[in-house]
A protein has these predicted regions:
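Active-site helix of classical SDR
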Residues: 123, 157-158
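Conserved glycine-rich Rossmann-like NAD(P)H-binding loop of the short-chain dehydrogenase/reductase
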Residues: 30-47
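Residue(s) in the substrate-gating loop at a strand-loop-helix junction
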Residues: 142
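The beta1-alpha1 cofactor-binding region of Rossmann-like NAD(H)/NADP(H)-dependent oxidoreductases
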Residues: 41-42, 60-72, 105
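Conserved glycine-rich cofactor-binding loop
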Residues: 16-17
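C-terminal helical subdomain
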Residues: 174-177, 181-182, 197-236
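Conserved mid-core segment of classical short-chain dehydrogenase/reductases
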Residues: 93-109
Length: 236
């Protein structure tokens, strides 16, 4: 693949595995310099070693910690001098019915803080940098940010992400910043480590990463606002 983006910087949250890691690999192949944010420092540093320390920066960080995110973005700017694109991809799911079963207040709070507050904080902290570069803000939602998924607070957090993406797009009109909501269906990633798979067809993390790069590779005047990506045969 031709390296076309050697001067551009992409910051990815949730970068240590799954969609985030595959997006980092594909972006590196296109020549992006990478600032990679994740809680799992060991996996993050393994990925940086794989992709090359000259062009990739590990930023261990919990996106639910505002100050830690601010510091991570500052370090990325100090290292690379600019940020051209941000992929707010951090998020997870836990079994979360609203009725029946044991109470899980800590899990609920952690999920809302990561999926909603963390994503909003990523936007708030990075958008000033993207205005400078007329850059691109991408955020991971979900197919369940469009439909009602039973027994699932996670679905409610992704409805919130859908609203966040639309609000950011409206705010950034006239700034030159593009905004893209990536909405995967069922994807085979470590996401399913804590919840049962639905037993339907699956996409790979690479399928979603290709979609992210497709949106980023459009001409500056083309703003792909929403990409809903399901595997063929997924029933919902």
């Amino acid at each position: 693949m031709e390296k076309r983006k050697h001067d551009q910087v992409l910051l990815i949250t949730g970068a240590s595995s799954g969609i985030g890691a595959e997006t980092a690999r594909m972006a590196a192949a296109e020549g992006y310099r990478l600032a990679l944010v994740a809680r799992n420092e060991e996996k993050l540093r393994e990925l940086v070693t794989e992709l090359g320390e000259d062009t990739t920066l590990a930023l261990p960080c919990d996106v639910a910690d505002w100050d830690a995110q601010r510091q991570a973005v500052d370090l990325a700017h100090q290292r690379f001098g600019r940020i051209d694109a941000v992929f707010a991809n951090a998020g997870f799911s836990k079994g979360s019915p609203f009725y029946g079963g044991p109470d899980k207040p800590i899990e609920w709070k952690e999920m809302v803080l990561t999926n909603v507050y963390g994503a909003a904080a990523t936007a708030r902290i990075t958008l000033p940098e993207l205005v400078k570069t007329r850059g691109h803000f991408l955020i991971t939602g979900s197919v369940v940010g469009h439909i009602t998924s039973t027994k699932n607070l996670y679905s409610a957090t992704k409805w919130a992400v859908t609203a966040i993406a639309q609000s950011i797009r409206n705010e950034m009109v006239g700034s030159g910043v593009r905004v893209t909501l990536i909405e995967p269906g069922v994807v085979d990633t470590p996401f399913w480590g804590t919840v049962p798979k639905p037993g339907t067809p699956e996409l790979s993390a690479a399928d979603i990463a290709r979609s992210v790069l497709f949106a980023m590779d459009q001409p500056p005047h083309v703003d792909i606002n929403t990409m809903l990506i399901r595997p063929v045969g997924q029933p919902h």
